[in-house]
Amino acid sequence: MALAALAVPWIAALVLDRDWTQVSGPPVRVAILQGAIPQDMKWLEANRETTLELYAKLTREALGEPLIVMPESALPDLANNLVPYLGRLYNEASARGSALVLGLVRASDDGSNYFN
């Protein structure tokens, strides 16, 4: 039993010393936006516009990077309610050659379910 316990780390080292992925091109620069807004503050209606303005500003500062990523549920509203805002961000980003990745909360058409 003791021998088996000693063998496990050696076997794990052999198995883990493998390339599990392969490079498929040059590295991609990514801008990751972080508003650092506490969750309990961000979702207050009184802070909605300030939060949206902050993320628009951070996005504009990152324009030109190939990929701009916002944290999951960074924007304090349902995607369904942010269509004009998201359209402006998308247009600004694509005009500068940037792609946006966002994690958004979305409501079903009847509003009975929410998805992330």
What is the role of each PLM region?
Residues 2-19:
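Internal/C-terminal transmembrane anchor helices
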Residues 14-116:
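Soluble catalytic regions of membrane-associated enzymes that act on cell-envelope
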